[in-house]
Amino acid sequence: MMQAAALLATALLFGGMVLFSAGLAAFLFSVMPPPEAGKALRKAFPHFYLFVMGSAAAGAVLVAPGDVVSSALLAAIALTTVPTRQVLMPAINAATDAGDRRRFGLLHGASVAITVVHVLVAGYVLARFLAPPGGA
């Protein structure tokens, strides 16, 4: 039962990150003027990062009894999301507010890279459920 809960938490993490990062921003910019879409995203991202931290931490705890590697990977996602939310996101917002496009581009690129790595790691953890440790 714990493995099923761990799988669901990890799938929620993976799907939520993909949907939010690949879908929400594109959708908002397609239906709203850019300044309004940017404001909406600015309000959404703190919640997104809390979702990532919570679902990754839950997955880490739930999978730990059966797979310490997956647990460590999910814990790493949760832990590395903290500075992304608390340091990088405010720096991106400050660059936007200052009109510093170069700094925004660098910082936003870093946040995208972090999210891509998180998605790939969560995907790897999901794949590990198909071949559990010690399995054939």
Which residues does each PLM region occupy?
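Polytopic transmembrane helical bundles with strong interfacial aromatic enrichment
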Residues: M1-A136
